[in-house]
From Swiss-Prot:
Pfam families with a match to the protein in the record: Metalloenzyme
Protein name, entry field: Phosphopentomutase
GO MF annotations, alphabetized: magnesium ion binding; manganese ion binding; phosphopentomutase activity
Sequence positions that bind Mn(2+) 1: D13, D327, H328
Compartments, record wording: Cytoplasm
């Protein structure tokens, strides 16, 4: 008998809660995503997260301890060697990743691009982080005239290749991306995803076509999601969750356009009758505010998210469990534009917790979440992680 019929897991992408013990190895001493945002905002207004116990993990400006938190609270330390989205999420679902995925804020190394040019017979232009629409405005015409390939990246571990469909036929573009995928399996380049980005149109009016193709990496082992799906439980992936796991262990995928759309979809799943896991990633914190080093925007986004939580609380059933966490930090006050190696918060709440919650022991790996989900549904336990299911008292 499952303790909880439905588990709703929410990952606030990049919402770290202070430097991890190994932060110095990552160049992240002093990083503190929520703490620094709270200082910048002269106090964060997150009353619903506070009720759950956020300030009991650690007091920050505007975020105080409460006498009787509604839920259980602690923080988690990442065990894997990376601080990227895929590593964090894969660890949450029970894997340990010892090869970090690389990000390329300065563009890709010359030796990689030289090899790609040699193997494809086409010149490469671009080679920088950019938005897909902006890079087409800037380089689309040159690409058409020269037959070169526009290579660009983002704040995530991706290598994207754009070409006009009438200049580089789709079949050729897909072959080129397969070559790039092979080359970037090398540990020194380890890229999470290669994406074909075909476009059409004329200068000043380029549009990306639906013929995008992703060459992702499947998780390096079976995750708790695979075990759930194989045991006929529902695994509803909201936002970029399905992409992060390359569809592995997913029974239904709901795309989102923004954090608020993500919260809408979460409310939709709360209205659904299912047994299993609903897994939401809220990416805006990271993509729009963390990497762009925008503490004001980040703080406002956190407050907007918090304001949506009463809708979630109102729809939770007695046999539901809500888990809120993050996958890494991305301190908008920290130098650079990269993620930061931090502890992440963990809040656990169910309406069945009539006495409220208390502090859980510090979690030594994000995989404790996967272990807890696995134990709840009686599926094979992951190799890594310790369940805290029995510590959650009704």
């Amino acid at each position: 008998m499952n303790k909880y019929k439905r588990i709703f897991l929410v990952v606030m992408d990049s919402v770290g809660i202070g430097e991890a013990p190994d932060a110095e190895q990552f160049g992240d001493l002093g990083s503190d995503t929520i703490g620094h945002i709270a200082e910048h905002m002269n106090g964060l207004q997150m009353p619903n997260m506070v009720k759950l116990g956020l300030g009991n993990i650690r007091e920050m400006k505007g975020i105080s301890k409460v006498e009787k938190p509604l839920g259980y609270y602690t923080k988690m330390q990442e065990k894997s060697t990376g601080k990227d989205t895929m590593t964090g999420h894969w660890e949450i679902m029970g894997l340990y990743i010892d090869t970090p995925f690389q990000v390329f804020p300065e563009g890709f190394p010359k030796e990689l691009l030289d090899e790609l040019e040699e193997k494809t017979g086409r010149k490469i232009i671009g080679n920088k982080p950019a938005s897909g629409t902006e890079i087409l405005d800037e380089l689309g015409q040159e690409q058409m005239e020269t037959g070169s390939l526009i290579v660009y990246t983002s704040a995530d571990s991706v290598l994207q290749i754009a070409a006009h469909e009438e200049v580089v036929p789709l079949d050729e573009l897909y072959k080129i991306c397969k070559i790039a995928r092979e080359l970037t399996l090398d540990e020194k380049y380890m890229v999470g995803r290669v994406i074909a980005r075909p476009f059409v149109g004329e200068p000043g009016n380029f549009t990306r076509t639906p013929n995008r193709h992703d060459y992702a990496l499947k998780p390096f082992g079976r995750t708790v999601m695979n075990e759930l799906k194989d045991s006929d439980y529902d695994v509803i992936a909201i936002g970029k969750i399905s992409d992060i796991y390359d569809g592995e262990g997913v029974t239904e995928s709901l795309r989102t356009k923004s954090n608020m759309d993500g919260m809408d979809k979460l409310v939709d799943t709360l209205n659904m009758d299912f047994t299993g896991l609903s897994f939401l990633n809220l990416v805006d914190f990271d993509a729009l505010f963390g990497h762009r080093r925008d503490p004001q925007g980040y703080g406002e986004a956190l407050q907007e998210y918090d304001a949506r939580l009463p809708e979630v609380f109102a729809k939770l059933q007695e046999d539901d469990l809500l888990l809120i966490t993050a996958d890494h930090g991305n301190d908008p006050i920290h130098p650079g534009t990269d993620h930061t190696r931090e502890y992440v918060p963990l809040l656990a709440y169910s309406p069945s917790m009539k006495e409220g919650g208390q502090e859980l022991p510090l979690r030594q790996t994000f995989a404790d979440i996967g272990a807890t989900v696995a134990e709840n549904f009686g599926v094979k336990m992951p190799e890594y992680g310790t369940s805290f299911l029995n510590e959650l008292k009704k």
